[in-house]
């Protein structure tokens, strides 16, 4: 069977592994996931959208146009109730340096220092886009509600996972197994919404 190559517009190995696990768990065969390190470099547009959906779609369009491959891209972040939904689309660079998880977590804790437990509600949000060259564009969204803890806990995950306690649980996202996180997380929920479109790509190669 010919494999449908699908580009994920990311160099984050954990994101690539997450989508591969979700495809495997859903029994979707015939899709080969590749990341940005597996294709020739191209100019990546900055994330300037006002919403997660705008950023995800822009990244997916860029990847599909540059490589000729169907491209999946996501934009995700943390929306904290007490901060009026921030850091939102600025989540990865909340402290001023893109991708500095420790600094971002430290700043968030400082901003919520005097916020009582009952007002520490938050949700992870993920928008995922799939763009097929010369074909369809699909944009989906997943949300994961919870609260922000008082200190980082757990070694797994990335981003704000060590601070985020999902609703109905007593451990942080960073303390969950990969399988448990896939089943519940915002990105897992969004990616599962893309499964029919990804399965259709696999069907086209049979």
From Swiss-Prot:
Catalytic activity: XTP + H2O = XMP + diphosphate + H(+); dITP + H2O = dIMP + diphosphate + H(+); ITP + H2O = IMP + diphosphate + H(+)
Cofactor annotation remark: Binds 1 Mg(2+) ion per subunit.
Gene Ontology terms, MF aspect: dITP diphosphatase activity; ITP diphosphatase activity; metal ion binding; nucleotide binding; ribonucleoside triphosphate phosphatase activity; XTP diphosphatase activity
Entry keywords, A to Z: Hydrolase, Magnesium, Metal-binding, Nucleotide metabolism, Nucleotide-binding
Superkingdom to which the source organism belongs: Bacteria
Name of the top EC class for this enzyme: hydrolase
GO biological process: nucleotide metabolic process; purine nucleoside triphosphate catabolic process
SUPFAM superfamilies from the UniProt entry: ITPase-like
Gene Ontology CC annotation, any one: cytosol
EC nos: 3.6.1.66
Binding site for Mg(2+): 75
Catalytic residue positions: 75 (proton acceptor)
Cofactor: Mg(2+)
PANTHER family linked: INOSINE TRIPHOSPHATE PYROPHOSPHATASE, INOSINE TRIPHOSPHATE PYROPHOSPHATASE/HAM1 PROTEIN
Function text: Pyrophosphatase that catalyzes the hydrolysis of nucleoside triphosphates to their monophosphate derivatives, with a high preference for the non-canonical purine nucleotides XTP (xanthosine triphosphate), dITP (deoxyinosine triphosphate) and ITP. Seems to function as a house-cleaning enzyme that removes non-canonical purine nucleotides from the nucleotide pool, thus preventing their incorporation into DNA/RNA and avoiding chromosomal lesions.
Family: Belongs to the HAM1 NTPase family.
Protein's name in the database: dITP/XTP pyrophosphatase
The organism of origin for this protein: Nocardia farcinica (strain IFM 10152)
